[in-house]
């Protein structure tokens, strides 16, 4: 679920990685991994494989698996708040 700005900046195989895009792709893969397998079953190796990065890159951006999970929770809460703010509740 990359937003339009991120999708427009998708890299080609021969270009250098955009650090912001790389972090976002790791986060998106982690959202799916944690949703599917839970915090204990999620594997950073699988997230790294999905994003063509390494575990070292994940730890560079998020510090630890726990830090990555925290970022996933924060992103999900951000999305929920964005959806809530788009609701039209004036008539209630």
Question: How does the language model describe each region?
Answer:
Residues 1-21, 32:
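N-terminal intrinsically disordered/low-complexity leader segments
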Residues 7-12, 54-56, 84:
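A short small-residue
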Residues 13-17, 21, 63, 67, ...:
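Residues at secondary-structure transition points
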Residues 25, 29-36, 82-90:
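Solvent-exposed, amphipathic alpha-helical segments
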Residues 25, 33, 37-67, 71:
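Helix-turn-helix
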Residues 70-92:
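Amphipathic alpha-helical linker/stalk segments
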């Amino acid at each position: 679920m990359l937003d339009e700005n991120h999708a427009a900046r998708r890299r080609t195989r021969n270009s250098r990685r955009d650090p912001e895009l790389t972090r976002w792709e790791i986060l998106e893969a982690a959202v799916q991994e944690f949703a599917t397998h839970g915090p204990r079953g999620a594997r950073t190796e699988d997230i790294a494989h999905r994003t063509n990065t390494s575990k070292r890159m994940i730890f560079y951006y998020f510090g630890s698996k726990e830090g990555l999970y925290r970022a996933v929770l924060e992103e999900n809460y951000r999305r929920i708040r964005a959806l809530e703010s788009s609701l039209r509740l004036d008539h209630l």
